[in-house]
């Protein structure tokens, strides 16, 4: 098949197709001055998004927008297509045009009817070196000049069907079809054939004006190409499939666990914030119950227990302290006064509040219980040597013996009760005169209260501070009618089922109270308020006081009864002094004189 090559010649701008001259060279080459730069371009500006086709590969303009801003008027360029196996050429044929011919409509010609002299082939270049999917620029340029077309694959024939759907009557790529050339075609030449009338719009013109060019044959030799000014690696089908198969890393899902979605207290999953801090539902409920009930917890270790999802329920004290440490606000928790509406944060104080000491009521009640236990005889060391349950015993013996026994029991209890008072936190810090006044004023009250709590009024057993156990009838002649009031008070006290913690607070309040003649009554009042708050917290949340209304009031109501019993004791001592059967001990006599109201 003869190869005809077109040689470029100069032509004035705007020359019409009829004014062009054509000449054949002796070598069989065909020269034409017809190809003006405008026609050579034939509107195949690859930066135009109209040429791109919707395929499985990324849009062609996506690549071109990043590497070029436009094309200048240049000679026709070559498509390079890396192929595996034997090298083949691409044949460009005319595809019949529809609805755009002004003068005549030529029927499509079959491949056999086309003259061989008009066949033109594109010779593909050798396959480039495989590159990474990143499409990095290689040192050996794949394009010979900036105006060259991008790599095409054989399957891109289907793009003509997509472009035919454009709004304009002519599809630019519809002018071409691609087929493989016979093997052995020289690589150095590029041939192209136009069969039939070719109508290419050069500039924006009215729809009725067109450039009509008869089908001609020309060739573009390789040597006339300009040196490459830009390198761009070829887009291989294998690389494109790898790009499409590669999964783009998606952002973490909204519900995936992260540090922002963990509870600040135990580390469990937390959906939102509660009381100012992102916490889980478990820690939110624990904090709410603790604040609403004003509960006080005790740490059995060193107040540094680990608080996590698995061990958060082991130590309530450390868990609540961590809730406060991470910033949970107690004032936001709804109380009875905020019932029916959400709590709101109070306004910020002008000066930062000083942090309260770590749970002082807990340490106070523990000290009170310890002082009570140390000042009471053990149940295994009680002295039953003088105990007799004989109803006739009150009639036997001398009165002086019973009176002396009465004085001995009082003096024996006095030293034990004083030792108990010295162990009360804060009592030893008071002035010595106030300590003596408080103790002497409350001695008889403490004597009756402790005796009533230890004794068993049902069996008539009275257990004194020194461990001596006597029957109620054995004390009648020494105590007189006072013993009956003590037993009755003991019965009422036993029926209240007071635990040892509440009783320790009641005993301390019986002594730490306002007395006439105190040197520093304010300090006494502060200590009294601490004990009252300690008793209130304990009774309300720790020993079933929630199920018994007015339980705290009933406990505090025992203190006035003790005052009445103390008055009865003073009357008994006064009566024994008047009787003068047995002289009272000096400490009892001083106690009597100091506690007289006149």
UniProtKB/Swiss-Prot annotation:
CDD domains: NR_DBD_NGFI-B, NR_LBD_Nurr1. Residues 260-335 bind DNA. One of its GO terms (cellular component) is nuclear speck. Pfam families: Hormone_recep, zf-C4. A motif (Nuclear localization signal (NLS1)) lies at residues 338-350. GO terms for biological process: adult locomotory behavior; canonical Wnt signaling pathway; cellular response to corticotropin-releasing hormone stimulus; cellular response to oxidative stress; central nervous system neuron differentiation; central nervous system projection neuron axonogenesis; DNA-templated transcription; dopamine biosynthetic process. A motif (nuclear export sequence (NES2)) lies at residues 568-577. Residues 360-595 form the NR LBD domain. A zinc finger (NR C4-type) spans 263-283, 299-323. Keywords: Cytoplasm, Disease variant, DNA-binding, Dystonia, Intellectual disability, Metal-binding, Nucleus, Parkinsonism, Receptor, Transcription, Transcription regulation, Zinc, Zinc-finger. Expressed in a number of cell lines of T-cell, B-cell and fibroblast origin. Strong expression in brain tissue. It is found in: Cytoplasm; Nucleus. The keyword Cytoplasm applies. GO terms for molecular function: beta-catenin binding; DNA binding; DNA-binding transcription activator activity, RNA polymerase II-specific; DNA-binding transcription factor activity, RNA polymerase II-specific; nuclear glucocorticoid receptor binding; nuclear receptor activity; nuclear retinoid X receptor binding; protein heterodimerization activity. Residues 352-361 have a biased composition (Pro residues). Gene3D superfamilies: Erythroid Transcription Factor GATA-1, subunit A (3.30.50.10), Retinoid X Receptor (1.10.565.10). Interacts with SFPQ, NCOR2, SIN3A and HADC1. The interaction with NCOR2 increases in the absence of PITX3. Interacts with PER2. Transcriptional regulator which is important for the differentiation and maintenance of meso-diencephalic dopaminergic (mdDA) neurons during development. It is crucial for expression of a set of genes such as SLC6A3, SLC18A2, TH and DRD2 which are essential for development of mdDA neurons. It is linked to Intellectual developmental disorder with language impairment and early-onset DOPA-responsive dystonia-parkinsonism: An autosomal dominant disorder characterized by global developmental delay affecting motor, cognitive, and speech domains apparent in early childhood or infancy. Most patients also show movement abnormalities, often hypotonia with later development of dopa-responsive dystonia or parkinsonism. About half of patients develop various types of seizures. Belongs to the nuclear hormone receptor family. NR4 subfamily. This is Nuclear receptor subfamily 4 group A member 2. It comes from Homo sapiens. The gene is NR4A2.
């Amino acid at each position: 098949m003869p190869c005809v090559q077109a040689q470029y010649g100069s032509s004035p701008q705007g020359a019409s197709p009829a004014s062009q001259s054509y000449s054949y060279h002796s070598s069989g080459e065909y020269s034409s001055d017809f190809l003006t730069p405008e026609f050579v371009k034939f509107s195949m500006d690859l930066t135009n998004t109209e040429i791109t086709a919707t395929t499985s590969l990324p849009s062609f303009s996506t690549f071109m927008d990043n590497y070029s801003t436009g094309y200048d008027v240049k000679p026709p360029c070559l498509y390079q297509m890396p192929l595996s196996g034997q090298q083949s050429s691409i044949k460009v044929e005319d595809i019949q045009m529809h609805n755009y011919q002004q003068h005549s409509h030529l029927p499509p010609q079959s491949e056999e009817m086309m003259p061989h002299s008009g066949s033109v082939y594109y010779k593909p270049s050798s396959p480039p070196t495989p590159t990474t999917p990143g499409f990095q620029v290689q040192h050996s340029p794949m394009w010979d000049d900036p105006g060259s077309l991008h790599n095409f694959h054989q399957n891109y024939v289907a793009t003509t069907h997509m472009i035919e759907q454009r709004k304009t009557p002519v599809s630019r790529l519809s002018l071409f079809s691609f087929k493989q050339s016979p093997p052995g075609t020289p690589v150095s030449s590029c041939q192209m054939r136009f069969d039939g009338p070719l109508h290419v719009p050069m500039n924006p013109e009215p729809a009725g004006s067109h450039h009509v060019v008869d089908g001609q044959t020309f060739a573009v030799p390789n040597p006339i190409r300009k040196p490459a000014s830009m390198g761009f690696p070829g887009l291989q089908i294998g690389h494109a499939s790898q790009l499409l198969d590669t999964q783009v890393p998606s952002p973490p899902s909204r519900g995936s666990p992260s540090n922002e979605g963990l509870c600040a207290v135990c580390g469990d999953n937390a959906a939102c914030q509660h009381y100012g801090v992102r916490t889980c539902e478990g820690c939110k409920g624990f904090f709410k119950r603790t604040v609403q009930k004003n509960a006080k917890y005790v740490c059995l270790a060193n107040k540094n227990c680990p608080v996590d999802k698995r061990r958060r329920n082991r130590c309530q004290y450390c868990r609540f302290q961590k809730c406060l440490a991470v910033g949970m606000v107690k004032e936001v928790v709804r109380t009875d006064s905020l019932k029916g509406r959400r709590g709101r944060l109070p306004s910020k104080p002008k000066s930062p509040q000083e942090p309260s000491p770590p749970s002082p009521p807990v340490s106070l009640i523990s000290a009170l219980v310890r002082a009570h236990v140390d000042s009471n005889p053990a149940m295994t060391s009680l002295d039953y040597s003088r105990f007799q349950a004989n109803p006739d015993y009150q009639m036997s013996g001398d009165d002086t013996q019973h009176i002396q026994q009465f004085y001995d029991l009082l003096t024996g209890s006095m030293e034990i009760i004083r030792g108990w008072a010295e162990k009360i936190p804060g009592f030893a810090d008071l002035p010595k005169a106030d300590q003596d006044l408080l103790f002497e004023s409350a001695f008889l009250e403490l004597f009756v209260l402790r005796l009533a709590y230890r004794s068993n009024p049902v069996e008539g057993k009275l257990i004194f501070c020194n461990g001596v156990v006597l029957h109620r009838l054995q004390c009648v002649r020494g105590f007189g009618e006072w013993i009956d009031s003590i037993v009755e008070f003991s019965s009422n006290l036993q029926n209240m089922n007071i635990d040892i913690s509440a009783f320790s607070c009641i005993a301390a309040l019986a002594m730490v109270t306002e007395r006439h003649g105190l040197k520093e009554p304010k300090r006494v009042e502060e200590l009294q308020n601490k004990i009252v708050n300690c008793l209130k917290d304990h009774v309300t949340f720790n020993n079933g006081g929630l199920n018994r209304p007015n339980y705290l009031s009933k406990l505090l109501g025992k203190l006035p009864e003790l005052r009445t019993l103390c008055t009865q004791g003073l009357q008994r001592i006064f009566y024994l002094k008047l009787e003068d059967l047995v002289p009272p001990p000096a400490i009892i006599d001083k106690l009597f004189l100091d506690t007289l109201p006149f």
